[in-house]
């Protein structure tokens, strides 16, 4: 359930932010809401089977070769058979959606005037930015804590590291939401690129502070 919820937490807001609620944006409620909910459910279910289901197949002995890809296809890249690898980049997607709607004001994708091109560029742009963040946080952990060791437990284990890549992304979401909801998305007096840059710097500093406090005392 948690893994499915992680996917839905990305797809549901992305459908409104990136795809602008299309193709049901012109419908009245509750038809529009139910249609987007159903679309979110179906797409999340498809992504679940592509990313998380194989993890379920290795939880049993012997591995469930007839119901899932065993070992999972991401094993060699992620250095683990755990679906925490997918949890990591999908959690980053959720965070980037909120960044895009809040502190970034969908910039620079708002400069694309063709509606269908803007929506697709924003949707896949969120995924691309999320992958970049995911890889950055992974290598940041290796710089701080050393290389991940497959078979190790706790903070040196690759599956633990991937999970905490997603959690690190959440650390940066906290100051972004604070800035958006409690500070009126400050600053607003400059041009959009300058506003976005200043907000991003503030969120970066806030995220680093939370990261340091969490791993020092948690």
Question: What name fits each language-model region?
Answer:
Residues 1-8, 34-35, 45-49, 68-95, ...:
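Alpha-helical transmembrane segments of polytopic membrane proteins
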Residues 46-69, 132-150, 209-218:
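Membrane-helix interface motif
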Residues 6-12, 129, 206:
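Transmembrane alpha-helices
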Residues 28-46, 115-133, 192-209:
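Transmembrane alpha-helical segments of multi-pass membrane proteins
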């Amino acid at each position: 359930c948690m893994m499915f919820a992680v996917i839905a937490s990305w797809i549901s807001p992305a459908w409104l932010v990136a795809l602008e609620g299309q193709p049901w944006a012109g419908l009245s409620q509750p038809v529009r809401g139910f249609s987007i909910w159903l679309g979110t459910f179906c797409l999340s279910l498809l992504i679940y089977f592509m990313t998380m289901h194989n993890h379920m197949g290795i939880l049993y002995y012997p591995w469930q070769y007839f119901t899932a890809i065993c070992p999972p296809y991401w094993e060699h890249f992620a250095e683990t058979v755990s679906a925490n690898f997918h949890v990591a980049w999908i959690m980053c997607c959720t965070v980037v959606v909120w960044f895009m709607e809040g502190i970034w004001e969908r910039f620079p994708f708002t400069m694309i005037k063709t509606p269908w091109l803007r929506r697709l560029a924003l949707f896949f742009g969120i995924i691309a930015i999320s992958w970049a963040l995911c890889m950055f946080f992974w290598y940041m952990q290796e710089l701080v804590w050393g290389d991940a060791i497959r078979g190790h437990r706790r903070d040196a284990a690759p599956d633990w590291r991937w999970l905490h890549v997603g959690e690190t992304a959440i650390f940066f979401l906290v100051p972004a939401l604070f800035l958006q909801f409690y500070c009126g998305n400050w600053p607003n007096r400059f041009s959009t690129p300058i506003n976005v840059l200043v907000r991003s710097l503030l969120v970066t500093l806030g995220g680093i502070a939370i990261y340091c406090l969490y791993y020092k005392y948690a």
